[in-house]
């Protein structure tokens, strides 16, 4: 009789443990899908580790996740889990493997970066420095603020836009309205890249705000 009770207890424990593992797995799996959509991750090599302890009987069929002011896309991330009327704070670790950009050769400070300066490699994304570029297109035509060495990951803190217009430069200002266009010459009051807003001062002292086009002209729409 005692032997039967022992086997029965072990059986119940096994079912509970299996159910708990399935719940934890399902939550991690749902988090994986959330991060893939949130960060547009194409990689299949993604793993989410939940660091916040959950109750053993916790289960949520349709959880809703929300990011909490995160500065990082990978590594330790703060999440709000909404399950019906329940709100839970989770600290999770996102591990992912995918492509990112490194310098193919030494890039001297002040260089307008080109495609042949770069190369893509595959590795752990969660161990990269903050703001690392994952796509070449986001980096090409930017200017590096310091020397970048071969095989070094490149971050957004190491580059700036390429200035089409520089501070105090004389620029063509085009004021555009319905069926008319007026052209002036003005002085830029700051540096500016293509499609950026910039303020210019006309000869009469009036200050206008416009958008820089690819010809280094400032377009003011009325």
UniProtKB/Swiss-Prot annotation:
GO biological process, one term: bacterial-type flagellum assembly
InterPro entries documented for this protein: Flag_basal_body_FlgA_C (IPR017585), Flagellar_FlgA (IPR039246), SAF (IPR013974)
Cysteine disulfide partners in this protein: none
PANTHER family documented for this protein: FLAGELLA BASAL BODY P-RING FORMATION PROTEIN FLGA
Main location: periplasm
Its biological purpose: Involved in the assembly process of the P-ring formation. It may associate with FlgF on the rod constituting a structure essential for the P-ring assembly or may act as a modulator protein for the P-ring assembly.
GN (gene name): flgA
UniProtKB keywords: Bacterial flagellum biogenesis, Periplasm, Signal
Family under the similarity heading: Belongs to the FlgA family.
Pfam families the record matches: ChapFlgA
GO cellular component, one term: periplasmic space
Name of this chain's protein: Flagella basal body P-ring formation protein FlgA
């Amino acid at each position: 009789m005692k032997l039967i009770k022992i086997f029965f207890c072990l059986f119940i424990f096994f079912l509970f443990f299996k159910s708990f593992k399935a719940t934890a797995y399902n939550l991690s799996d749902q988090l994986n899908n959330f991060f893939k959509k949130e960060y547009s991750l194409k990689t299949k090599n993604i793993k989410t580790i939940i660091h916040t302890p959950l109750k053993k009987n916790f289960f949520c069929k349709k959880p809703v996740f929300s990011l909490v002011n995160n500065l990082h896309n990978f590594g330790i991330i703060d999440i709000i889990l909404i399950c019906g009327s329940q709100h839970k704070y989770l600290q999770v670790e996102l591990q992912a493997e995918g492509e990112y950009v490194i310098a193919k050769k030494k890039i001297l400070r002040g260089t307008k970066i080109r495609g042949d300066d770069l190369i893509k490699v595959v590795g752990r994304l969660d161990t990269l420095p903050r703001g690392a570029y994952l796509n070449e297109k986001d980096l090409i035509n930017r200017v590096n603020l310091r020397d970048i060495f071969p095989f070094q990951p490149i971050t957004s803190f190491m580059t700036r836009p390429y200035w089409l217009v520089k501070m105090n430069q004389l620029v063509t200002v085009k004021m555009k309205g319905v069926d008319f266009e007026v052209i002036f010459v003005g002085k830029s009051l700051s540096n500016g890249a293509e499609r950026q807003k910039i303020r210019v001062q006309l000869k009469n002292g009036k200050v206008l705000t416009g958008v820089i086009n690819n010809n280094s002209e400032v377009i003011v729409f009325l």
